[in-house]
Amino acid sequence: TGLSYYLKYAEDSTEDDPTIIAKGVDENGNEFEKTIHINEINPKSATVVEMRALEAHMGVKKLGGFTSLPMEAGAMGLNDRTDFMDMFQKQIGDMKLLLQKKTAAYYQYSMQAYWDFMNKK
């Protein structure tokens, strides 16, 4: 059925080193557990699980209650890495082409939140 997991803060997570545990089943039905250090995430080369952990930590508003990430991210596997900033640009362009101004503005907001995160590093 695809990638399925939950996120929780690690017991040793701190304000200076926020750490999240992702635990679940990958797209092949194999169980996994990953430790994600938020400060080490690079949205220009990240997995979907890393970005969902970053999204949760930052409290980015979710479109329709699901995710702030572009729709294409839903097709990614556990270890697939991509440039989410490029993915956002493509999604914004697609939404503008379809005259979906509110959706385009939402993805612009989301992308800006992740740019701000990268610029704080």
Predicted regions and their residues:
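Type III/flagellar secretion export determinants
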Residues: 1-121
